[in-house]
Amino acid sequence: HVQQVRLLERDLQTLVPALDEEGLPERLRIALNADSLATWWAEAVGEFCAQQHLLLDLVVEDQTVGLKRMRAGEVAACVCASERPVAGARSVLLGAMRYRALASPAFIARHFPEGVRAELLSRTPALVFGPDDFLQHRYLASLGGDGGFEHHLCPSSEGFIRLTEAGLGWGLVPELQVREQLERGVLVELLPDKPIDVPLYWHHWRNGGQLLGLLTDQLVRSSRQWLVPLA
């Protein structure tokens, strides 16, 4: 894999500086889900990238399918919901992203005039990130639903929230991303006692070199500030 070779070459250049004739910054290609990119990722890696003179080539994939990029050898690492690593890689649990079912007050008044009930959710328009996003399906199944539901597709974390605020549908939104909207009452939680947690794992190549190892240590430490710990 090209990424692995480059990372090992970087380690050699660190030991023998004369080999690093160009002195260019290293670049890592990493796959991660859009919600991580929109919330905790930047703060988790910002200072590290500056210190290590590291450039990132980020590839956005749903957390359920990001591992396919590792399997194809296209990325050096990925953040995804799958625990089992591909051959030649390791995975480490970072924590869980907590999602809450939210809607605008106007949407709730229009679709739930007598109060929100779990069995009614599948009969109202929802918002789904993309064709690989089955989080709403899992959520409805946990409430006893077993069929399809009407939904909009919105492949943007920021746009997802804007559409929810505009009353187009209800959606499962990262708690990290909407604390201000919840405080202001712009968005309201439909079922306050029923969040859904999505575990996030960091996958990286075993022979990824020192830089990837340092980045792994940084993510394990810093992710605790934002993600929900899992037993």
Stretches with model-predicted labels:
Residues H1-Q4, W40, N207-S222:
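Short amphipathic alpha-helical coupling segments at ligand-binding clamshell hinges
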Residues R71, R90-L168, E180-D197, R224-A231:
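C-terminal regulatory
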Residues H1-E21:
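Alpha-helical "hinge/linker" immediately C-terminal to small N-terminal DNA-binding modules
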Residues D62-Q63, C80-P85, S104-P105, S156, ...:
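Beta->alpha turn/N-cap motifs
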Residues E9, D20-L28, E119-R123:
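Immediate post-signal peptide segment of exported/extracytoplasmic ligand-binding proteins
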Residues L200-H204:
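A short beta-strand structural signal in non-transmembrane regions
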Residues A76-A81, G169-V173, L190:
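Paired acidic/hydrophobic, glycine-rich loop segments that form the ligand-binding mouth/hinge
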Residues P17, G23-A87:
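Central regulatory/effector-binding core of bacterial HTH transcription factors
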